[in-house]
From Swiss-Prot:
Record region (Disordered): 425-447
Gene Ontology CC annotations of this record: cytoplasm; microtubule
Principal subcellular localization: cytoplasm
Protein's UniProt keywords contain Iron-sulfur: no
Acidic residues composition bias: residue spans: 432-447
Family membership noted in the UniProt record: Belongs to the tubulin family.
Gene: tubB
Protein name stated in the entry: Tubulin beta chain
InterPro entries xref list: Beta-tubulin_BS, Beta_tubulin, Tub_FtsZ_C, Tubulin, Tubulin/FtsZ-like_C, Tubulin/FtsZ_2-layer-sand-dom, Tubulin/FtsZ_GTPase_sf, Tubulin_C
């Protein structure tokens, strides 16, 4: 029944993936070795979206773990849920990609990719009716970015009609791991524009801000950041895993969220925000959830939606929530902030409900928005890219792996096109003729 095959590539992807599996195993009542000891039939009803049932009441994630060096894999294997995964589904090289996109995409990664595809094929064959794939990776490194996008395009070739969702960690403006991040990210986005159906953009800096501002953590660890990401991933996939009044799957999400095929980069948010360990002790109401969910401080990508407009957005509410209250709240948000929504897509807020709340909460909400302000994120990466590419800095690492400068130029222009497409739809209004855009007056959103 509508299975999803999950891939995690590179260090970042594997750490986020591990946090995700930990979260949803808990929600489905599985312990660290995949044995079910839950309390509710709802946990079992659609378990098979993400898990295969093995003998002895054990459930095994339909996950493929990929990396070009064994380090992160060993850490996952040694972690609390390391025994959950099927041992054959760990596919790793020995050399590492060294933050080099070309190594991940053309040399080291390309050698490993067939081995990964064999595992993916085996997982897909074990499905009744495969719905699609989800990939967790970062765009700033070598393996997740280079090999991740290679896998996406290979899977696209083999399963052209299945959905492809990616949870992509975008390099942040201030926190940088490596100097070549802008190169890796631009080359990756160039691939994602063509090959992904929906990309949820997450960025470390926004996560740091949430941890420090909202959760009051002075010194957030990657564990805390991954906890936030896994909350969102669990929220986005909740409709697939539990029965609810208004269910949704990856394809419905895409149909409702993507007005133009290239514009499939979403911002995500979650409410109520809680730190690991400290569950909120106060009752939350639907208005509060809605308020927090639409709060720019709550977005997990560093772009402020007040600088753009929403093309579409969708909200997933979990828990014992009154349908009517949710509808009223969402309508309320739209009416009060109409300047932040494009007027040429009338009912552009989609809601879905699921009756099973996350662990430790009475109710929660997950937000996915397709906002034109995501262009800020691409602009920022593009500017950094241009600054280095103009001087051909660090290029020899890429050309040495057989890449051509032309590819960089193409990726750069594709990303610039993406930015201007977002800008064009931000400024479009109903009254204008077909192709006349008002260049003089960009829309300012008044608070």
């Amino acid at each position: 029944m509508r299975e999803i095959v999950h891939l995690q590539t590179g260090q970042c992807g594997n750490q986020i993936g591990a946090a995700f599996w930990q979260t949803i195993s808990g929600e489905h009542g599985l312990d660290g070795s995949g044995v079910y000891n839950g309390t509710s039939d709802l946990q079992l009803e659609r378990m098979n979206v993400y898990f295969n049932e093995a003998s002895g009441n054990k459930f095994v994630p339909r996950a493929v773990l990929v990396d070009l060096e064994p380090g992160t894999m060993d850490a996952v294997r040694a972690g609390p849920f390391g025994q959950l995964f099927r041992p054959d589904n760990f596919v790793f090289g020995q050399s590492g990609a060294g933050n080099n996109w070309a190594k991940g995409h053309y040399t080291e990664g390309a050698e490993l990719v067939d081995q990964v595809l064999d595992v993916v094929r085996r997982e897909a064959e074990g499905c009744d009716c495969l719905q699609g794939f989800q990939i967790t990776h970062s765009l700033g490194g070598g393996t997740g970015a280079g090999m991740g996008t290679l896998l996406i395009s290979k899977i696209r070739e083999e399963f052209p009609d299945r959905m492809m969702a990616t949870f992509s960690v975008v390099p942040s403006p201030k926190v940088s791991d490596t100097v070549v991040e802008p190169y890796n990210a631009t080359l990756s986005i160039h691939q994602l524009v063509e090959n992904s159906d929906e990309t949820f953009c997450i960025d470390n800096e926004a996560l740091y801000d949430i941890c420090m501002r909202t959760l009051k953590l002075n010194n957030p660890s990657y564990g805390d950041l991954n906890h936030l990401v896994s909350a969102v991933m669990s929220g986005v996939t909740t409709c697939l895993r539990f029965p609810g009044q208004l269910n949704s799957d990856l394809r419905k999400l895409a149909v409702n969220m993507v007005p133009f095929p290239r514009l499939h980069f979403f911002m995500v948010g979650f409410a109520p925000l809680t730190s690991r360990g400290a569950h909120s002790f106060r009752a939350v109401t639907v208005p509060e959830l809605t308020q927090q969910m639409f709060d720019p401080k709550n977005m997990m990508a560093a772009s402020d939606f007040r600088n753009g407009r929403y093309l579409t957005c969708s909200a997933y509410f979990r828990g014992k929530v009154s349908m009517k209250e949710v509808e009223d709240q969402m309508r309320n948000v739209q009416n009060k902030n109409s300047s932040y929504f494009v007027e040429w897509i009338p009912n552009n807020v989609q809601t879905a409900l699921c009756s099973v709340p996350p662990r430790g909460l009475k109710m929660s909400a997950t937000f996915v928005g397709n906002s034109t302000s995501i262009q800020e994120l691409f602009k920022r990466i593009g500017d950094q890219f241009t600054a280095m590419f103009r001087r051909k800095a660090f290029l020899h690492w890429y050309t040495g792996e057989g890449m051509d400068e032309m590819e960089f130029t193409e990726a750069e222009s594709n990303m610039n096109d993406l930015v201007s497409e977002y800008q064009q739809y931000q400024e479009a209004s109903i009254s204008e003729g077909e192709e006349e855009y008002d260049e003089e007056a960009p829309l300012e959103a008044e608070e």
